[in-house]
Amino acid sequence: MLSCLGLAFLLLSLLIVQPQVLSCRVGDQRECDASPFVPGHNLIGEGFDMVTMQRKGAYVIDMETYLNPNRTCTLCSNQLKGHQLQKVILIKVKSWTRACSGTITLMIAAFKIFLCVKYASARLDVVGTQSTVYKFASNMMREDRYTFSTQKRMFSHYSYRVSAAPPFSSEFLKDLARLPRYYNSSTSSHYKDFLHTYGTHYIHQVRLGGYVARVTAARTCLSTLNGMSSNDVHSCVSMGIEVGLGNFKLSNVPSPCSKFLQNHGFSTVFSSYIHHHYTVISGGNGWSGEFSLTHNDSLGFKNWQHTLKDHPDVVFFFLRPIHLLIPTKTKRVGIKVTATKYLEDNAMESSPREPECTGNTPNLARNCCPQQVLKGTLRVTSIRAWGLNGDYAGATERLANKRLEIFVNITDVINSDYPYWNVDYNFGKVYTLQVLAVEIWDEDLQYDDLLGSCVRYLSQGDNSFTCAAESGRFEVQYTLTCDPYLTGERCGHLSH
């Protein structure tokens, strides 16, 4: 199984880990009973569900036994806690680490979903389809095209791993013993229940500490309209993170990015925000993980950071399939089959790539996003009039004059009080907030008389309108076609 912390085509890890030499010794039972456990001792050996991306709270490995058969244990000096002696369970304590900070940034391509795991050769993005982050991203993508970017600030203090032959927890052994020996259609429900309790994998190795991750969903085409690529969005949010954590000033942020961070100042007809975010926090206490991107809002972050040594949580882990632990071959096969089916049933097809438009299509960027809104193609298809009174010379001579702003197109002269111009005037690309002005004239030898005029705002689709003349009326028919990926009455909205 190939695991990937999600959707990424770029992953930059700047975490600096500084391991300390462990100082451990053997303690007798009296010392062992009196000493506290190492922080987060129970955050390893736990079952894990790869679909929900959540720990199950049920332990595969015995995480409480700390005494060896000779009634001794291992006591280690925790340099992060004033060299306090702390006991370890029968696992491997790899190292303490100094409180070390760094930023793990993750550029996430549009249309893709977090927390993907390639499962075997199924060619499916499997994992996390029931996780809260996945649901956030899915809900965003139902609404519009989004580009996702994640910034994570991580602190790692402790590192543990399960020993080569770990002792099983008593509950795990009992549930395993109750499991039918063979997997088939009549026993499959028992295997599903077992999977529901313990998950698909177990945590084999961990780094403990804390992290806060901010998942930003930015409207792809709205960003493009305002001159920001997906890379620009990612860099901008990264600068906003530094502003919020007190490492940068908003005044030093370029103007387009500053407006982006403040979610305003974008010259479109949209009323909705250009970006939304979802926050995930692990470890520590006393802070929700929320902070501003436009001013120094770092107090909660700094206070939370100080709580991580006493209240660590998993910030990085290695998983192993539970079935690899099962000693009985038939049960091992049954658990593997059940887990495989569960993962495949909750998988999604591989996320589509961001569309790419090539060629010379006007008003369309390479990512198939409009470069301007309120743009379309205008065609006037017919004009007809009735009941017009012309000059005294006989049948009235008529001239239809259509214009859009300074663009003027003049029809042929028709000698009738009921003229009909079956025409196709293509005005080409127009700004849809302009108006269509039509004038009907009576052409004379000396002076032309204006018989009627009309002005209308444009609307998308096939349209007609009727206007009054000095006597009679006239009707105009036209078609306004929005540019690709634009919609709305005046082509002012982005289509999904």
Indicate where each model-derived feature is located.
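Classical eukaryotic N-terminal signal peptides for Sec-dependent ER targeting/secretion
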Residues: 1-12
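Generic "edge-of-domain/loop-turn" microfeature
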Residues: 244-246, 259, 285, 387, ...
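Acidic, phospholipid-interacting surfaces centered on C2/C2-like domain membrane-binding loops
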Residues: 337, 341-370, 389-392, 459-496
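Residues at beta-strand starts and edge strands
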Residues: 231-237, 374-376, 396-398, 434, ...
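Peripheral membrane lipid-binding modules
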Residues: 390-472
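Membrane-permeabilization and membrane-interfacing ectodomains
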Residues: 4, 16-381, 386-388, 421-424
